[in-house]
Amino acid sequence: MRCVVFNLREEEAPYVEKWKQSHPGVVVDTYEEPLTAKNKELLKGYEGLVVMQFLAMEDEVYDYMGACKLKVLSTRTAGFDMYNATLLKKHGIRLTNVPSYSPNAIGEYALAAALQLTRHAREIETFVRKRDFRWQKPILSKELRCSRVGILGTGRIGQAAARLFKGVGAQVVGFDPYPNDAAKEWLTYVSMDELLSTSDVISLHMPATKDSHHLINAKTIAQMKDGVYLVNTARGAVIDSQALLDSLDKGKIAGAALDAYEFEGPYIPKDNGNNPITDTVYARLVAHERIIYTPHIAFYTETAIENMVFNSLDACTTVLRGEPCAAEIKL
C-alpha cells in the first residue's frame, strides 16, 4: 500500500512520522509543495493521495491521476469544494475528507472573535497606542450574557460554538435546514428570518454549497438588527463581501470578524509582505477598521493538526483496504 502526501507543512511532519510508526506496512512519501500540473509526475506509483490544496488543480492533474490508476484522494480538510468532483468520478477516484478535526478549536475562535468585537478590543488598542486612556462611549460594551447569539449552521462546529456561547450566559438560537436533537442542549431552533432579525451576534458555521453561496448578502443583511456583529469561521463564499463592506460603511453592521474570504486561495498561507494584494475587495476587508481579519486559522491548534493528519491517512488507507469509510464523500 503506497500513499503520497503533498503540501506537507512543518507542523504536520511529526504527526506523519508518528502515524507511519504505527502503520509499518504502509509506504508514505511526502512533498512540501502543492500538487500541480508541473509536478504531477510525482504521483506515479501511488494508490492513495493525501492533500491540502488552497488553489484548484488543473484538469490535466486529474487526467494524470486516472492514467496512474490512483484510487483515492484524501483531503486533510473538512471542505472539499476546491476539488473537481466530476473529474474524480470520471476517473473512478474516490474522495474522503476530515469532517471533524477539532470543532472545539473553531468554536473557541468564534467566541474569542465575538468577544473582541463586542468588547471593542481593536478600538481600545488604537486609543491606548495613542496614550488616550479615557473611558468613552465608543468603547462602552454590551455583555454577551445580555445578548442573543444566532448560530447559522448547527453541525459539529456550530454546536461547539453554541455550547461555548451558552457557557458565558448568552441566549443562543440557531437555524439549520437539517436540525438535530443534539444541538437543542445548547440552543433553541428558530426560523432564519427570526435569527437574522433578532440576533445581536451572528456566527456562521455552514459548509460551502450552492444553497449557502452568498447567504449573507444585501437582502439578508437588511433583515438584521442595526449594529449587529458578524463572525465567519466557515467558508468565505457564504458572504457577499461587497455587500458586507457596504453595510459596514453605512453602520448597519457594527463590526465583523472574518477568518475566510471567498477568493483567498492565491494569498494564504503565504507571506504577502512584499506582494501587493491585487484583489481590491480583499484589500479593503483586510484594512477595514471595523473588521478583524485572520487568514483561515480558526482551526489552527496542535490537536487539530494531529487529527487532520491522522484522520486523512486513516481514511485513505481504509479505502485502499476496500473497507467502508465514514469520511468518504459521495460523488
Curated annotation (Swiss-Prot):
Query: Pfam families recorded for this chain?
Result: 2-Hacid_dh (PF00389), 2-Hacid_dh_C (PF02826)
Ranges in coiled-coil conformation: none
- Give the enzyme's EC designation: 1.1.1.28
Q: Which GO terms describe its molecular function?
A: D-lactate dehydrogenase activity; NAD binding
Q: Which residues constitute the catalytic centre?
A: R235, E264, H296
* Lineage: superkingdom: Bacteria
Q: Mind telling me which CDD domains this protein's record contains?
A: LDH (cd12186)
The protein in question is named D-lactate dehydrogenase
Q: Where does NAD(+) bind?
A: R156, I157, D176, M206, P207, T233, A234, R235, D259
Q: Which UniProt keywords apply?
A: NAD, Oxidoreductase
Family matches, as PROSITE patterns: D_2_HYDROXYACID_DH_1, D_2_HYDROXYACID_DH_2, D_2_HYDROXYACID_DH_3
Q: Give the protein family.
A: Belongs to the D-isomer specific 2-hydroxyacid dehydrogenase family.
